[in-house]
UniProtKB/Swiss-Prot annotation:
Assembly behavior: Forms a heterotetramer with UvrA during the search for lesions. Interacts with UvrC in an incision complex.
Domain observations: The beta-hairpin motif is involved in DNA binding.
Organism from which the protein derives: Cytophaga hutchinsonii (strain ATCC 33406 / DSM 1761 / CIP 103989 / NBRC 15051 / NCIMB 9469 / D465)
Pfam families: Helicase_C (PF00271), ResIII (PF04851), UVR (PF02151), UvrB (PF12344), UvrB_inter (PF17757)
Domain Helicase ATP-binding: 24-182
Principal location listed in the UniProt entry: cytoplasm
Motif (Beta-hairpin): 90-113
Localization annotation: Cytoplasm
Protein name: UvrABC system protein B
Protein family: Belongs to the UvrB family.
GO molecular function, one term: excinuclease ABC activity
Length: 673
């Protein structure tokens, strides 16, 4: 099936020339190109057109999960008839296994897996193995971490056809071999159940299940069903069932792996004993023999990824298989916000190796654990045959690798200009910020505020919320799907101000935001260098009333460079608009479009806490609230009631109860006045 781009827009501004140049580069087999596009210039739409014209399977690599979710939503809208998948780390919480030699402290691995994201990861690998070429996978840098051998995954696929002859027990055994569990109670993803001649199986990567009805040893019918009710959706001629886990292996491979593990265990024990390190020898023998016994009994063990080299048939030091190995050889790599993503990829290997060296050295793991790792940067480059680096501020690496093949996209299709920048002193900055926020709220716009520290973000959020400004705070500890939900609510107007530290820079599509406030803009460092400032300024570039305020007592070199570059682009854009008679307009997305772009958030149905609670009720306990007049307090009660009603409507009764208690506490303050 071919890619079929669906959009009500046509390429305009710099887009047609950019698309033409990039497509020509791909067709010439140029190994690398750079798309230097300003915020809001439609870089994602440009890349969608390149994918449409080149018809290549594409991996879109993003540096954070929030941006990956947004890109996933946009590509789903552009290509509704094609396969668009999402592949990020599935850990809500992850504490890696580690050993601290100085204190003798061993830390067990601890983790919490997000089942919805695990489903999406399996869906991505299953789609890649389906043979279709019309596939886009949006991934975070977790895609360079080791996963199962794609050949083992492919060999484990179960294919059934209506009328096929197969023994029922053999069919059930084939499900068990690819890590599906038989159940008589809860029918969940990755399980199957048997009732007489009827077998129901719930794929680990889907939201629907299948019913296989047997007549003796013949597959009489295959039906797609609703998992919860068993209601038939449609009749199927065939069923292709992919494994329930990325680390799947056949029985022969398992037995062969155990044999090699035992050989390496013997060598490691002998090495420790020669060095008279008997404690380490005893530890590695006990731990490894326990793992081997688990593998023999269950087919897997805790930490089985540390033995992945044996299952994959790799030599020591040989790179692991990763998501990229599931792609065809001629795939196209798009590195979004490459100035941040590339350094992330560089850093992955070193941090992983340092931790595992101690585990091997002190007898907690065999040396094979060192080969369960992310790719080195050289390995990543070796399998990255054709790349397009996308950034408003490309770094030296991308510019050098592309050998000057830089495609500029400065003109926005909407005619929008880079925002005006104002510098204000830090004296009375909070009062000034509050005035600016109120002005923007009256216009129906949203506001982003970026601070240098988490503590300042917390305090500012509490203050703004306390004086009646609907504010949320986003930070690195907020779960991935919750972040997407927060951004969705900002865009839909559930609240007006979003405060953050380092999550409000690259790539976020927020046309409703007309004001970006940068606190402590003159504090040179990672969060206030030229690239960071240009990216942060860009958050206000999708709105015709875009404005940036830098609160600073001096103009640093980074500030000046960011202001100069923004002014250069703004002048180019103004000249283009005057030449073509274009009036800048904000492209406000409809509610349906916003819901579609943030669709991945719908996977998450759990309670959300955006501001860390410090006692109940949070607002009424704030001393600022006690100083407000009755009119302001009444407004806060009305707002709390609306929030309570909304929470109750969403069946979020814990949150509804919190708002109810807040209302009662605020009413007590009014009564006491």
């Amino acid at each position: 099936m071919a890619f079929n781009l669906t959009s009500k827009y046509e390429p305009t501004g710099d887009q047609p020339a950019a698309i033409k140049q990039l497509v020509e580069g791909v067709e010439r087999n140029d190994p690398a190109q750079v798309l230097l596009g300003v915020t809001g210039s439609g870089k994602t739409f440009t890349m969608a057109n390149v994918i449409q014209q080149t018809q290549k399977p594409t991996l879109v690599l993003s540096h954070n999960k929030t941006l990956a979710a947004q890109l996933y939503g946009e590509f789903k809208q552009f290509f509704p008839e094609n396969l668009v998948e999402y592949f990020i780390s599935y850990y809500d919480y992850y504490q890696p296994e580690a050993f601290m030699p100085t204190s003798g402290l061993y830390i067990e691995k601890d983790l919490a897996i997000n089942q919805e994201i695990e489903k999406l990861r399996l869906s991505a690998t299953s789609s890649l193995m389906s043979g279709r070429r019309d596939i886009i996978v949006v991934a975070s840098v977790s895609c360079i971490y080791g996963i199962g051998n794609p050949e083992e995954f492919r060999k484990s696929i179960v294919v059934l056809h209506k009328g096929q002859q197969i023994n029922r027990n053999k069919l059930l055994y084939s499900f068990v071999e690819i890590l599906y569990n038989r159940t008589t109670r809860d029918f969940t993803r990755g399980t199957f159940r048997v009732t007489g001649d009827t077998v129901d199986v719930y794929p680990a990567y889907a939201d629907i299940a299948y019913r296989i009805q047997m007549w003796g040893d013949e597959v009489e019918s295959i039906q797609m069903i609703e998992p919860e009710t068993g209601k038939r959706i449609s009749e199927q001629k065939s069923l292709t069932l992919f494994p329930a886990n990325l680390f799947v292996t056949g029985k022969d491979s398992l037995n062969n792996a155990i044999h090699h593990i035992q050989d390496d265990l013997m060598k490691q024990v002998q090495l420790f004993e020669m060095e008279k390190r008997y404690g380490e020898a005893k530890r590695i023998q006990e731990r490894t023999e326990f793992d081997i016994e688990m593998m023999r009994e269950l087919g897997y063990c805790s930490g089985i990824e540390n033995y992945s080299r044996y299952f994959d048939g790799r030599m020591p030091g040989q790179r692991p298989f990763c998501l990229i190995d599931y792609f065809p050889d001629d795939f196209l790599l798009v590195v979004d916000e490459s100035h941040v993503t590339i350094p992330q990829i560089r850093a992955m290997f070193g941090g992983d190796r340092a931790r595992k060296t101690n585990l091997v050295e002190y007898g907690f793991r065999l040396p094979s654990a060192m080969d369960n790792r992310p790719l080195t940067f050289d390995e990543f480059e070796s399998i990255n045959t054709q790349a397009i680096y996308v950034s408003a501020t490309p770094a030296d690496y991308e510019l050098q690798r592309s050998e000057g093949a830089v495609v500029e996209q400065i003109i926005r299709p909407t005619g929008l200009l880079d925002p005006q920048i104002f510098i204000k002193p830090t004296v009375n900055q909070i009062d000034d910020l509050l005035d600016e926020i109120q002005e923007r709220i009256e216009m129906g716009d949203r506001i982003l505020v970026t601070t240098l520290t988490k503590r300042m973000a917390e305090e500012l959020t509490k203050f703004l919320d306390g004086v009646g400004v609907r504010t949320r705070y986003i930070h690195s500890e907020v779960k991935t799907l919750d972040r997407v939900e927060i951004l969705r609510e900002l865009r839909l107007g559930v609240f007006d101000v979003l405060v953050g530290v380092n999550l409000l820079r690259e790539g976020l599509d927020l046309p409703e935001v007309s004001l970006v406030a940068i606190m402590d803009a003159d504090k040179e460092g990672f969060l206030r260098n030229v690239r960071s400032l240009v990216q942060t300024i860009g958050r206000a570039a999708r709105n015709s009333n875009g404005k940036v305020i830098m609160y600073a007592d001096k103009i640093t070199a980074s500030m000046q460079q960011a202001i100069d570059e923004t002014s250069r682009r703004r002048a180019t854009q103004l000249a283009y608009n005057e030449l073509h008679g274009i009036t800048p307009i904000t492209v406000n997305k409809s509610k349906d479009e916003i819901m579609g772009q943030t669709k991945v958030a719908d996977s998450n149905k759990f309670n959300k806490q955006y501001i860390e609670p410090e006692g109940e009720p949070s607002l009424a306990a704030d001393p600022v609230v006690a100083m407000l007049n009755k009119t302001e307090l009444t407004k806060m009660i009305d707002r709390a009631k609306k929030d309570m009603d909304k929470a109750a409507k969403d069946l979020d009764f814990v949150e509804a109860a919190r708002y109810r208690d807040e209302m009662f506490a605020l009413q007590k303050i009014i009564d006491s006045k």
